[in-house]
A protein has these predicted regions:
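C-type cytochrome heme c attachment motif
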Residues: 50-57, 112-115
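Extracellular/periplasmic catalytic domains that process cell-envelope and extracellular macromolecules
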Residues: 37-38, 69-72, 106-110
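Bacterial Sec-dependent N-terminal signal peptides
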Residues: 1-23
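Short active-site neighborhood of thiol/selenol oxidoreductases, capturing the structured segment around
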Residues: 39-53, 77
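A short beta-strand-turn-helix
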Residues: 25-43
Length: 174
């Protein structure tokens, strides 16, 4: 009888863990802003999706051995999953993520879309270029230059560090 009860409890626990929602986007941002205040940093808020190839490239570049310590010294990188499809909606998407993206003018931007915020949540910059087009994951020399300029404006990165980031992001042509 005890074994039967144990199996039932385990089954129910497994069921709920499989159907658990991701964390609310506003709570994610709230935690990041709190951490940014404590550490005297800005927040790099990145909206992405599991199906988005450019999002994966952006994450890979930001997490490369050369770039990650530079970004982490100046920002709290924060990811919010939006625009998931099918079964991935429940599996990956953060509730209220799209509303948060819309709040920062990213409704029609495409992915990835990112915003640089100060520790109070004020927008310092975003992924729109001078022509109001989303850079997304910068890859061309022009896009990466614009990204570098935004980093320079919102961080204490040195010219040498900014060049390291530029070199890691610029798309190499074979």
């Amino acid at each position: 009888m005890k074994l039967r009860k144990l199996i039932t409890v385990l089954f129910i626990g497994l069921f709920f863990s499989l159907h658990a929602q991701q964390e609310d986007a506003n709570k994610i941002l709230e935690k990041s802003l709190s951490q940014a205040k404590k550490e005297n940093k800005n927040v790099l808020l990145i909206f992405h999706a599991s199906w988005c190839g450019w999002c994966k490239k952006m994450e890979k570049n930001l997490n490369s051995d050369a770039v990650k310590p530079l970004i982490d010294k100046n920002y709290i990188p924060t990811y919010v999953s939006v625009q998931e499809r099918g079964e991935n909606i429940k599996k990956y998407e953060n509730p209220n993520g799209q509303d948060l993206m819309n709040k920062y003018q990213g409704k029609e931007a495409g992915l990835p879309f990112w915003v640089m915020l100060d520790a109070k949540g004020n927008v310092l910059d975003n992924s729109f270029d001078k022509n109001k087009e989303n850079i997304g994951c910068p890859a061309s020399p022009e896009e990466v230059s614009e990204f570098r300029d935004k980093l320079q404006k919102t961080s204490s990165l040195t010219a040498s560090q900014l060049q390291t980031i530029y070199d890691n992001f610029v798309q190499k042509k074979s």
